[in-house]
């Protein structure tokens, strides 16, 4: 395993490049399209990392950001309404996950996941986007 703010079972950082990663690459391509539609300026995004995590009861993520990423994202694969939310630190804003939800936010925004209280696993994929070098 590797050093991470995520205190849950994780894949490698570049799972979209691993064997069988073509399904994750499809998700990354979708995220890239959404980021281009939602960004206030035109840019061509590159996903420089992508990972999966499975949270079991008691697992959590400590508060952190993804600077210098332009966009960070998380996609919920298998969750229930009892699963832990995504919490944006120092705000009252939290997102309760549901299957198929994509959440995108600026990479500098601090966020965390409180301890998972449900017995149901919280399965998600996340990643970071930056501008493809020299292309705006």
Protein language model annotation of sequence segments:
Residues 1-42:
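Non-heme Fe(II)/2-oxoglutarate
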